[in-house]
Curated annotation (Swiss-Prot):
GO terms for molecular function: glycerol-3-phosphate dehydrogenase [NAD(P)+] activity; NAD binding. It is found in: Cytoplasm. Its EC number is 1.1.1.94. The gene is gpsA. Sn-glycerol 3-phosphate binds at K115, G144, T146, K199, D252, S262, R263, N264. One of its GO terms (biological process) is glycerophospholipid biosynthetic process. NCBIfam families: PRK00094.1-2 (NF000940), PRK00094.1-4 (NF000942). Keywords: Cytoplasm, Lipid biosynthesis, Lipid metabolism, NAD, NADP, Nucleotide-binding, Oxidoreductase, Phospholipid biosynthesis, Phospholipid metabolism. Belongs to the NAD-dependent glycerol-3-phosphate dehydrogenase family. It is an enzyme of class 1 (oxidoreductase). It comes from the Bacteria. The lineage of its organism: Bacteria, Pseudomonadati, Pseudomonadota, Gammaproteobacteria, Thiotrichales. This is Glycerol-3-phosphate dehydrogenase [NAD(P)+]. InterPro entries: 6-PGluconate_DH-like_C_sf (IPR008927), 6PGD_dom2 (IPR013328), G3P_DH_NAD-dep (IPR006168), G3P_DH_NAD-dep_C (IPR006109), G3P_DH_NAD-dep_N (IPR011128), NAD(P)-bd_dom_sf (IPR036291).
Length: 344
């Protein structure tokens, strides 16, 4: 359950659905968890209700979970920090967190379960960490096919802890492990981050397809060809094919493309059915739709490396208002034939 049977004190930064779910899991299996929300009013509501009524209604907070809005108080005397803030806030929170931590202790364990790219720079999150904290910092990326509601309820779950430092990867795997939660380890940080971000784009694509009632054949084709695109993109950035075929790649892709708990898939469904601008649909969903930010970042990177990523291109065109879902389908089907196994 814990590192050498010793409970840890863990700060979870970000009290949305995913951060709350991970905090609930960690505290339920014996760790002391301090969940941070940057908004004092939200933090007070969470602490008084003892559950996240907005995102995880009916799942009570364990006694070992406390909610804070003061970052310095949250980080006091912790063994480890898990960041689960939106990608656009990642750098700012990282800077503040590290400044506080370095004032109190020389070493701490760092991981994040945020998926996506930094919107302003199109950088992957590990690149931000290396820019801000140095190339030698140890960290882990936690990713895989997961829905917050199911993790919070204690349903069986498997994820990946990726780090170039095997001990760091194992630290987080051990911290999460219990009878209902299995965390595998590996070293391909780039591949794990790409899988976690790219699958959100494909979830939007399958949502658009299903919103147009194009059928199960079309959905399966999008998932299969989306997998090829993800591998092609990963090749350009140094990811391993084996990673793309694992939990953080194929596993997460299938989950988010086929279940309506995925807000990216729901976004695609609503966009196709309503024919409204993307911004209006995002506002109605009321949560961050990471795939919208991811597709803009991937488009910039794809243009830089001259990558052929046709599904991504059409999702991008729809989101920025350059095409409709119906037009995008026609463009994809008009493409010249090619070998199915041509990844480059």
């Amino acid at each position: 359950m814990t590192i050498a049977n010793k409970p840890l004190t863990i700060a979870v930064l970000g009290a949305g659905a995913w951060g709350s779910a991970l905090a609930i899991h960690l505290s339920r299996i014996g760790h002391q968890v301090k969940l941070w929300d940057h908004n004092p009013e939200n933090a007070a509501t969470l602490e008084s209700a003892r559950e996240n009524v907005r995102y995880l209604k009916g799942v009570p907070f364990p006694d070992a979970l406390s909610v804070q809005s003061d970052l310095k108080v949250t980080l006091a005397d912790v063994d480890a920090v898990l960041m689960v803030v939106p990608s656009q806030a990642f750098r700012e929170v990282l800077q503040k967190m590290h400044h506080i931590m370095m004032g109190s202790k020389s070493h701490y364990h760092l991981a994040w379960a945020t998926k996506g790219f930094e919107p302003e720079t199109s950088l992957m999150l590990h690149e931000i960490v290396q820019q801000e904290l140095g190339e030698q910092i140890s960290f882990a990326v936690l990713s895989g096919p997961t829905f917050a509601a199911e993790v919070a309820r204690g349903l069986p779950t498997a994820m990946v802890s990726a780090s170039r430092d095997q001990q760091e990867a194992q630290f987080w795997a051990d911290a999460f492990h219990c009878d209902t939660f299995r965390m595998y380890t590996q070293s391909d940080v780039v591949g794990v981050e790409i899988g976690g971000a790219y699958k959100n784009i494909m979830a939007i694509a399958t949502g658009l397809s299903d919103g147009l009632r194009l059928g199960a054949n079309a959905r399966a084709a999008l998932i299969g060809r989306g997998m090829v695109e993800m591998m092609r993109f990963g090749d350009a950035l140094g990811a391993k094919h084996e990673t793309m075929m694992g939990l953080s790649g194929l596993g997460d892709l299938v989950l988010t493309c086929t279940d309506d708990l995925s807000r990216n898939r729901r976004f695609g469904l609503m966009l196709a059915q309503s024919q409204r601008p993307a911004e209006d649909v995002i506002e109605e969903i009321g949560q961050v739709v990471e795939g919208v930010k991811a597709v803009k970042a991937v488009k910039l990177i794809a243009d830089k490396y001259q990558l052929d990523l046709p599904i991504m291109e059409q999702v991008y065109n729809i989101i920025v208002g350059q095409s409709t879902a119906e037009q995008a389908v026609k463009e994809l089907m008009r493409r010249h034939g090619r070998s199915e196994l041509e990844f480059g």
